[in-house]
C-alpha cells in the first residue's frame, strides 16, 4: 500500500479503473492539497500543450459553455483517438492539456465509457471558479462527443 492510498483511500482506489495516463494525472493533482500548487500544475500542463493548427479553430470545434475561447479537434489513428486543443486563457489551456494527455491514444469506446468522476478526484473543483469547473466538464463532454462520432463512423467538425 503506497502513501497516497493511505491518505486518499477512496480516490486512489477509484483511479485503478482509469486509463493509466489519466490515473497518473489524477494522482499528481491529489498530491497537492494547496490550491496554489494545483494552479501551478495546471499552468505547467498548459505550457507543455503543443500548438494547435489555426484551421482547427472553427465553430464546429469550439467548446460551448466556456467563458474562454476553447477549441478541440480529434483524429482517429489506427483505432485510437488523438486530440488537439487550445484556449486563449492559460489556466484553461492547462485543463485542455490535462485532458489531452489523459485521453490521447484511447479508443473511442474507452473515452465514451469514462465518467466525469475523475474531474472531482483531481481536487480541482476546490481550486477552480464555478465557471472554470463547468468549462472543464464541457471540454471533457466535447471530447466524448467527438469519440461518439468516431464510434458511429462519422467525422465531427473538421479534424
From Swiss-Prot:
InterPro entries (alphabetical): Fe-S_metab-assoc_dom (IPR003808)
Pfam families: SufE
Family according to the record: Belongs to the SufE family.
Protein name, as recorded: Uncharacterized SufE-like protein slr1419
Organism: Synechocystis sp. (strain ATCC 27184 / PCC 6803 / Kazusa)
Amino acid at each position: 500500500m503506497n502513501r497516497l492510498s493511505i491518505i486518499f483511500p477512496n480516490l486512489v482506489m477509484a483511479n485503478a479503473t482509469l486509463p493509466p495516463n489519466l490515473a497518473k494525472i489524477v494522482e499528481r493533482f491529489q498530491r497537492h492539497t494547496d490550491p496554489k500548487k494545483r494552479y501551478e500544475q495546471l499552468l505547467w500542463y498548459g505550457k507543455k500543450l503543443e500548438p494547435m493548427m489555426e484551421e482547427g479553430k472553427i465553430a464546429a470545434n469550439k467548446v460551448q459553455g466556456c467563458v474562454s475561447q476553447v477549441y478541440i479537434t480529434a483524429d482517429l489513428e489506427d483505432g485510437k483517438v488523438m486530440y488537439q486543443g487550445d484556449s486563449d486563457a492559460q489556466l484553461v489551456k492547462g485543463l485542455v492539456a490535462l485532458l489531452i494527455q489523459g485521453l490521447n491514444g484511447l479508443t473511442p469506446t474507452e473515452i465514451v465509457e469514462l465518467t466525469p468522476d475523475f474531474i472531482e478526484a483531481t481536487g480541482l473543483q476546490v481550486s477552480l471558479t464555478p465557471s472554470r469547473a463547468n468549462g472543464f466538464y464541457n471540454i471533457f463532454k466535447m471530447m466524448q462527443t467527438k469519440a461518439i462520432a468516431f464510434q458511429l463512423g462519422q467525422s465531427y467538425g473538421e479534424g
